[in-house]
Structures are given as structure tokens and as C-alpha cells.
């Protein structure tokens, strides 16, 4: 959806790409910056030069982890999603109070809590502007968000109470922090241009690149249906974020329903073919049992009549 939101009323097509990096190959901001440079170069090569390249692409990155949180009213462990770029443009989670954190924030000490964590620390959700500690370091609460309520996201998110914080801030708390998910929306002047740029220039390693803009197309659903049973085998060392697991769950259901639809659509055709074959078979039997013998008999009778006439004509003229 981010691709369509970013496109707006423009005639230019946009494509949404997700890159999932193995946990033992996670990358830093320097590689993101290098990819952005290559991305801009590729856009220029495609004759898409404009004054402000940021209008041709938008990106976000994230990683997950665990932190200890505390306030004057409570403490505990929480799941953290450390984010950078325009993360909440890609994932517009509903705000209950306060505001999102963005890359434009001068200070990287603002965090977003989910409802469960807000109730643990302060017994409510209207807590924007209050302070808390993460691993002993003071942070300011920017707001509270509501977790997605659809059945797929609810099933996919299993980390319990959690928070969102800036990737920069998280990197200061955790020495081995690294980006494991990179998301991109960019101009796609020709089919697979954006996907090709990502495959060519992004440091994906053994990870996986997903083209989200066409992931629910009919052809892809049929392909996924053929992969039933092996699709769930993950051998690349990638830990998908919960939103990707939710999307893959939706894909599985769509692939199954597509297969059912194809089978249902094919049944009348198959039935008609079977009936046609049976009719032809019966027609052949009738032809062999009735029509052909009669035709042979009539032919033989016609031959006998002609032979008799010839004989009569010959012997009759002799007698005269």
C-alpha cells in the first residue's frame, strides 16, 4: 500500500520492495547510505533526474530485540522494534495518544509504547511527554499505539508488550545492533526496474528480497500453491518481522483460495469434456453397430442390383 500512497496522482509507477537480512549478516547505516547513493545513480541513468531525488524513493529500516524498561510505577522486559527512515509511512499503526517518532526528530530519545506496556508503566495510555528508562537510560514517551487487530497480525505478533524507538538510540544501547529489515518504495519506470536495482545493489547476502507491489497477483498465487509444503521451510537464517509473517499468512490463504477457485472453474470444463468424450464414444459404438452394417448391406445390395441388371441386359439382348 505504501507504493500507491507514495505515487498519489502521479503517472509514474512505483514499486515497494522489502529486504530481509539474515541475523548473522545484519548491516549498519553505512551500507544503507551506500545503497541510497547507488539507488540515486540508477534513477539518474534511467533519465529520472529531478531537483529532489527524495521524491523518487522513500525507505525505512528496522531490527528487533529485547530491553528492560522501568518507570516510577512499574518495570519489566519489553520487545523493541528499532526503526529508522520513514518507518511509520510503511506501517501506519493507529495512534492512541501522542505522535510518531520520525527521522526528523533532533533528539533520538523519544519512544512509542504499545497499550500493554503503557499500562504496565503508568496504568493508562494518555502518557505522552512522561519519562521512562530503557536499560537504565532515560527516554521520553512520544505516544502510545494500538497493535493491529486483524487476525493475521494478531497471530503473527507473539512478543508481548513492546515499544518502538529510533534505530540510532537502540544502537547506543546495544553494541551488536544491526539492520535486519530494509523497506523501499521507488519509481518503477519499467517492469521489474526497482526489483532489479535492489537485487543488483543492495547487500542482501543470503537474505531474501520481496516485491510487495505484485505479491498477490494471480500468477504468483498459483506459484505459491505449487510450493505448498516447502514454502514454510526457512533455510536462509532470516527472522521475519511480524508484519511479514502476517503478510505470508495472508499469501498462504490467498494461494489456497486461488487454487480452489481454479479447480472450481475447471470442473465444468472437465465435466463437459468427459460428457463430450462419452457422447463421441457412444456415437462411435452406434456407428459401428448400426450405421456401418446398414451401409455395408445397402452397398452390397446396390452392387447385386447392378450386377443383375447387367446380366439381364446381356442375356436379354442375346435372346432377341
Which sequence ranges carry the predicted segments?
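Conserved beta-strand elements of the Class I
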Residues: 81, 111-112
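C-terminal single-pass membrane-anchor helix
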Residues: 213-316, 320
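Solvent-exposed, acidic/flexible segments
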Residues: 32, 110-111
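Membrane-proximal extracellular/periplasmic loop immediately following the first transmembrane helix
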Residues: 2-65
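Short, surface-exposed beta-strand/loop "edge" segments at domain boundaries and coil↔beta transitions
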Residues: 24-31, 68-70, 189-196
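Mid-to-C-terminal secondary-structure elements
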Residues: 86-95, 113-246
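The feature marks short, hydrophobic/small-residue-biased sequence motifs that occur predominantly
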Residues: 56-101, 105
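Extracytoplasmic
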Residues: 14, 75, 83, 105-108, ...
